[in-house]
Amino acid sequence: MAEKLTNEQQAAVDSRERSLLVSAAAGSGKTKVLVERLFSYVEREGANLDDFLIITYTRAAASELRGKIAKALTERMERDPGNYHLRQQMLRVYRADIKTVDAFCTALLRENCHLLGEDARGHALRPDFRVLDENEAQVLRERVLARTLDDFYDCLTPGGTLLADTLGAGRDDSALEDLVLELHAKLQAQPYEDKWLEAQRAFWRAVPDKIEDTPYGKILLNEVRRKARHCKNLLQRAAQEMCANDALNQKYAPAFLDASYQLEALEGKTAEGWDAARGVTIAFPRLAAVKDSDGGEMKARMKSLWDNCKETVKGFAEIFSASSDEAVEDLRTMASAMLALIDLTADFSRRYNEEKRRRNSADFSDQEHEAIRLLIGEDGAPTELSRIVSARYREIMVD
């Protein structure tokens, strides 16, 4: 007899007409809930197994999940051998869409790549396109990047010259190559590459007057705020714990509390801006001497905690090494170089894509981007193909 579901699991099985996230530890039964939810549709509502798109993260997981669904179906047929609808599912389980995102995108492209049209050089992706493995893609990227850099050096702009000089390019191109490939990797992670590139250009064309208004400043201030709060809480809890030890309470606890108050002040100042936070001084003096016999095991633990928080605060000094005006000036000085880097990466990306099209090949990122183009129009609305594909499925489940 199947193991009974918990109340929370049963609620996840029964929920309808809304998106649902099941979050739990590994091995707690999330896949089991998915299988039970799937069969709740089949048994209660007359659905078929191939009415659903079920996404997994690896091909092995997809195969394993199909096996679990087939096993669950067999168990149900044994309990109800006369159920014709269940017998039909034995045929459907092997044609149900249980696959990875990559496999889904590949199938979608092979069926509909004619809708993408040709690129600027007249190359179109054909249904028999080949998916490059990572080694092939890397070799091709390196070849295309070498040609791209040759043309970059032949037509250097002032920004390009600053970029090359800053990275020591010309003598050793490895730093520039690595930077272009790193930015290209980030570009490939964006659903709309051109829009992302234009957003980066817009930032560097008009750097804000305050560093806290830049993405970098916001990230750094949030990091300082989070770490200051964490260290403050650690020190305050430690001071409270040291009340149980007279020697530590007398020698260590006051310093812990003083540092925690300074960290609390820093946490508050991060909301006021860069320079306000930069102006907060936090002292971590040498702790007073405490005999091991008086401090016991707690002494070593508290000393370690103090040293860890002290190291964290040292990192704040590095972050706030420059004032807001100085940091903004540094960004503006590098703006032309950054714009040149963005344009260089965009040129490399275009050439790389054209070379893949010429070879009738695609990498994993291409499949996802082209699938988005097929399913979502330039205005952000679903395409006709999107509506057709959507109509195939009653629900999308992700394991």
Language-model regions, residue ranges each:
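Generic alpha-helical segment signature
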Residues: 31, 134-138, 334, 338-345, ...
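Short amphipathic alpha-helical coiled-coil/interface segments
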Residues: 137, 141-145, 345, 349, ...
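ATP-hydrolysis module of ASCE/P-loop NTPase motor domains
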Residues: 90-97, 116-192, 308-311, 317-321
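Conserved aromatic-histidine-acidic binding/catalytic patches
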Residues: 26, 53, 57, 93, ...
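SF2 helicase catalytic motif II
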Residues: 392-398
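P-loop NTPase Walker
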Residues: 1-117, 244, 355, 359-373, ...
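Conserved ATP-driven helicase/translocase motor core recognized via long
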Residues: 51, 177-362, 377
